[in-house]
């Protein structure tokens, strides 16, 4: 694996000289191997090590190189066709393979090759991009988007129209991460490498990027880029220093533990946010 890693790192430094006509079978095989391993869930662009998220930048480089190396090709999809560099994940699946991997995919959902879909995941008509990892038991609801290299944990609910930001460029940016047992409400957007920690509940219509103020009203503090575990978050606003106007903020209205969350429905938690 170290040889493959170094080959990809070296090639990425010369990426401007690489295109679909490049004759380098070793590089093509290395990139193909990495994409296949991400697709199977054996490799992840980001993973938790000793309680901290670690991003493997070389895997992002492999994904980017695949765009340089691959030419557009015809992709069949139901009643229509597509012209793209990345094939559909399920292009070669038959019923036996779908049953063996234990997922449910509802038409016209689109999952690109190089995205991992865990067991008991339900993919409604939605979009999952290359490099993403969707953990077992998760619901990707209708018109949700899971961006490139985004990491979605186990037993997560991504409600209708949710957007989880992708990140391939700029390369130094970290992927957006939704940890296990989170609920993301309809039409919410979590982007720019924000981490939503385990068991958090995000209400409908909450937008969080790296510059979004996340106000913890219980502790009277402002956070950036991270929603703490067990937080219940709703959209709101905070006043300006001179009191002339207010600007958007995400508001942590309460914290819940796993026991409370198991006993109380998501809607009840949000209705009692006051």
UniProtKB/Swiss-Prot annotation:
Q: Name one GO molecular function term.
A: 2,3,4,5-tetrahydropyridine-2,6-dicarboxylate N-succinyltransferase activity
GO CC terms = cytoplasm
Q: Where in the cell is it found?
A: Cytoplasm
EC id:
2.3.1.117
Q: In which pathway does it act?
A: Amino-acid biosynthesis; L-lysine biosynthesis via DAP pathway; LL-2,6-diaminopimelate from (S)-tetrahydrodipicolinate (succinylase route): step 1/3
Annotated S-S bridges: none
Q: What is its main location?
A: cytoplasm
Identify the residues that bind substrate: 104, 141
Keyword annotations: Acyltransferase, Amino-acid biosynthesis, Cytoplasm, Diaminopimelate biosynthesis, Lysine biosynthesis, Repeat, Transferase
Q: What class of enzyme is it?
A: transferase
Question: InterPro entries attached here?
Answer: DapD_Trfase_Hexpep_rpt_fam, Hexapep, Hexapep_transf_CS, THP_succinylTrfase_dom1, THP_succinylTrfase_N_sf, Trans_hexapeptide_repeat, Trimer_LpxA-like_sf
Report any one BP term from Gene Ontology: lysine biosynthetic process via diaminopimelate
The record's catalysed reaction(s) read:
(S)-2,3,4,5-tetrahydrodipicolinate + succinyl-CoA + H2O = (S)-2-succinylamino-6-oxoheptanedioate + CoA
For this chain, the family text in UniProt reads: Belongs to the transferase hexapeptide repeat family.
Q: How does it assemble?
A: Homotrimer.
Q: What is this protein called?
A: 2,3,4,5-tetrahydropyridine-2,6-dicarboxylate N-succinyltransferase
Give the species this sequence originates from. Idiomarina loihiensis (strain ATCC BAA-735 / DSM 15497 / L2-TR)
Source taxonomy lineage? Bacteria, Pseudomonadati, Pseudomonadota, Gammaproteobacteria, Alteromonadales
Gene it is expressed from: dapD
